[in-house]
Amino acid sequence: MIQFILNNQIIKTSVKTGVTLLDFIRNHKQLKGTKIGCREGDCGACTVLVGTPNNNSITYKSITSCISPLGNANGKHIVTIEGINLPNNLLNVTQKAMVSNYATQCGFCTPGFVVSMTGFALNNDKTTTCNDAISGNICRCTGYKSIEKAGIEITHKLQHKNDNAPLKWLIKEGFLPDYFESIPQRLKALLNNSGNASTSASLNSTKVANGTDVYVRYADQMAQENICLLANNPTLKGISFTENTCSLRANTTVTEILENKQLEGFFPKLKQFLKLVSSEQIRNMGTIGGNFVNASPIGDMSIFFLALNANLTIQNKNGVTRKISFYNFHKDYKVFDLEHDEILKEISFKTPKVYDFFNFEKVSKRTHLDIASVNSAGSISVKNNCITEAHFSMGGVAAIPKYLHKTNAYLIGKQLSNETVKEAEKILQLEISPISDVRGTATYKRLLARQLFFAHFLELFPNQIDLNKLTA
């Protein structure tokens, strides 16, 4: 039994957990405002908000419901476009802004934009812009400037939001209907009576976190299966720190990493790096464990954590754990060191010191919302101009996310200089084996590999490394 609140209605259903949330909303509940578009999580027409209990409040995030399993709604508040309408058919502030700025054309994309903007209004992160919030929404009529103007109008109104009681303020000012205020207590009561949907199948079944990859390819198959849902498993969530180590449970999302202040302290450009990873909705869904197990040769988070020399904790159905180095996890294309009754539980890495430097680079056909042609990350320790540790990784240049063993080994013990970087790049070219595909020819990818490798050093050591000398 899956139990959650859909807009203002308590839902108790025995529909299969693998059915998409979008199909349940439209076909079982006849709420047609949430649109069917790409069914790949790219266009945002199916955007809904997911409210997750957080102490005595609810944290809302936008997701694409077309690739989200229904079972993940268990114990949550799901909000569609119908759920943010005000009584007596009055328009809320976001809807008024869209109308007054002529931001609707054919109207197909409009519900998704309005829901994403409502998520922005509910978000208390001052560094997030309205454009960030709608980054995963596509307007096929290309009415973006009018939509951006609506976003600017909403942003100006939100400058007066009461940070001490944000939900009350949003209701009072007409952003949300007043039933939102009752959701925390209603969800709490529901959770006391509901089980964990993650227990609906054994670990020998198909395991799904938030579905951002597997539902793109196998949504129809997943709808028929009794899948093992991991997203609501509390033992797989959370970020923790010890004196020298950061540990992230496998269901930690990209957004949770991006918003973590301690991680940002270690990686000042963390937001800049991770804004290159997918869209707002997918970052809210995509987990690091899922990215690793997806085993894509160009998985952004795999490349990121390979460069941190991360370790993985793997657990079987009996609770027995084992640890391996992340660079030993991927064996071949889509082949990795995980048995059928095992799950990836935790990722850990040593936190950087003052002499450690980190950088992430990505080249794709579009700067944002695209799969990389080649991506790369590098972590390097330098003491007295001597490289004491090096961990560089690269995606799109091999059958697996590539940890550059030979390149890293060469760098250790060398002086940081243009000549060292040039020689290391020659070794890199011998390590990689790119192929020609839709994202570029093998020759092009080798050029990108060189440029991104150089870019790490130019970004981290601009006073010591000279591009002209590297390319001379």
List each model region and its residues:
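A basic, amphipathic helix-loop patch mediating RNA/tRNA/ribosome contacts
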Residues: 17-48
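S4-like RNA-binding module at protein N-termini
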Residues: 50-80
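C-terminal structural segment of proteins
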Residues: 10, 49-50, 62, 93-99, ...
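Eukaryote-biased recognition of intrinsically disordered, low-complexity regulatory segments
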Residues: 1-9
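Short, contiguous acidic and Ser/Thr-rich linear segments
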Residues: 10-18
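NAD(P)H dinucleotide-binding glycine-rich loop of Rossmann-like/cofactor-binding domains
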Residues: 75, 79-101
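Residue-level signal for mature regions of secreted extracellular proteins and peptides
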Residues: 31, 36-39, 59, 99-102, ...
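Short cysteine clusters
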Residues: 38, 43-46, 66, 106-109, ...
